[in-house]
Amino acid sequence: MEHLDLGPFSRASGTVRLPGSKSISNRVLLLAALAEGETTITNLLDSDDTRVMLDALEKLGVKFKRDGDTCVVTGTRGALPAARADLFLGNAGTAVRPLTAALAVNGGDYRIHGVPRMHERPIGDLVDGLRQIGAKIDYEENEGFPPLRIRPAQISVDAPIRVRGDVSSQFLTALLMTLPLVKTESGETIVEVSGELISKPYIEITIRLMERFGIKVERFGWERFTIPSGVRYQSPGKIMVEGDASSASYFLAAGALGGGPLRVEGVGRASIQGDVGFATALMKMGANVTMGDDWIEVRGVGNDHGKLDPIDMDFNLIPDAAMTIAVAALFADGTTTLRNIGSWRVKETDRIAAMATELSKVGAKVQAGEDFLVVTPPEQLTPNAAIDTYDDHRMAMCFSLVSLGGVPVRINDPKCVGKTFPDYFERFLALTQP
């Protein structure tokens, strides 16, 4: 198996410009494809997940030109041209869920599939919501999971659409982005969410981006959403993808563990991404954090003992960035508890199980529950631990931080970071010193 040996390091400092946000990139690509007019997208992320979205849009007849991190998309005025397509979408939830919804109302014959792990990630709640408006979607293998077959259907909305919110916020995102394309007599469609909506900031991203393309969603708490119906997205002309706040978390943590100053550029106070909340969690752990509109800087730890403070915190709002806290907990002066992270279990891997296994390899005592993780750091990190990454980009990036504990660490299958941040390790190594 291919591997990468890192460290030992004791310092981290410098400045890093973040790649574009994965969540924003794939949303903007689909919105631009559905819009009327031409959209120039800048700072578009170049990664496995954005490539599968672009490949899918190309197969669906969408015209675009890409040059570096700029992509010019010619919109289809709400009707994707291809009446038939077989779409391989890898393990990209940000492509599978929204495209399933968009194609369900497009009137064609489509197949959606991906890597084996994608066929283990649930999509049944989204399919149930789409079937409420007449969509014809069949499961090819296991009920509730891809691969999917989508067929032409008579779509009509005559009652509020109900969708569960406690498994993945991407189900709601997919419905919100698609429903403006469906005409109703009342001129609007209502979506009602059952259960506690997880990852609320990702829904806020969706709503903000839809507004940039001319569609305003009304939100009543997090339980009810009203979407205008039978209207077209309008291109904003130009739109810039802000830096990836989830990716920022690794560098911000490095600035705390390695003394800093370490600055990330591309996200800050003005960000529409919830994962900038990672900076607040890091401050609660005692890190020295300052923030501008589009930058965040960390300068080590501000307490007397020089270690991070342990925390007990609900991470429902920032589940991806919470993974970085789990590894930062190795450097805390006591036991850290991460709560309300049940969504980890249906991500690229079962992240609760994976995190517990790999933290144990470096000496931590870990208690893993259905939706929580309790991490007690060791007196001394175990050197030369070989970290398995489970084809999960975030596992690989998180555990690079172990090298800042003055011990070498081996990352197995390091190229899995290509899903969102292909040159992550080059950037990390440019900021770290023995």
Swiss-Prot record:
Keyword check for Transport: no
Pathway assignment: Metabolic intermediate biosynthesis; chorismate biosynthesis; chorismate from D-erythrose 4-phosphate and phosphoenolpyruvate: step 6/7
Localization in the cell: Cytoplasm
PROSITE patterns in the cross-refs: EPSP_SYNTHASE_1 (PS00104), EPSP_SYNTHASE_2 (PS00885)
Gene Ontology MF annotations: 3-phosphoshikimate 1-carboxyvinyltransferase activity
Reaction catalysis annotation: 3-phosphoshikimate + phosphoenolpyruvate = 5-O-(1-carboxyvinyl)-3-phosphoshikimate + phosphate
Keywords annotated in UniProt: Amino-acid biosynthesis, Aromatic amino acid biosynthesis, Cytoplasm, Transferase
Annotated residues for binding of phosphoenolpyruvate: K22, G93, R121, Q170, R351, R394, K419
Residues given in the record as 3-phosphoshikimate binding sites: K22, S23, R27, S168, S169, Q170, S199, D320, K347
GO annotations of cellular component type: cytoplasm
Residue positions of the active site: D320
A Pfam family per the record: EPSP_synthase
E.C. number: 2.5.1.19
Domain of life (superkingdom): Bacteria
InterPro entries: Enolpyruvate_Tfrase_dom, Enolpyruvate_Tfrase_sf, EPSP_synthase, EPSP_synthase_CS, RNA3'P_cycl/enolpyr_Trfase_a/b
One example of a Gene Ontology biological process annotation: amino acid biosynthetic process
Subunit record text: Monomer.
Protein family according to the UniProt entry: Belongs to the EPSP synthase family.
Function (record text): Catalyzes the transfer of the enolpyruvyl moiety of phosphoenolpyruvate (PEP) to the 5-hydroxyl of shikimate-3-phosphate (S3P) to produce enolpyruvyl shikimate-3-phosphate and inorganic phosphate.
Name the UniProt record assigns to this protein: 3-phosphoshikimate 1-carboxyvinyltransferase
UniProt source species: Paraburkholderia phymatum (strain DSM 17167 / CIP 108236 / LMG 21445 / STM815) (Burkholderia phymatum)
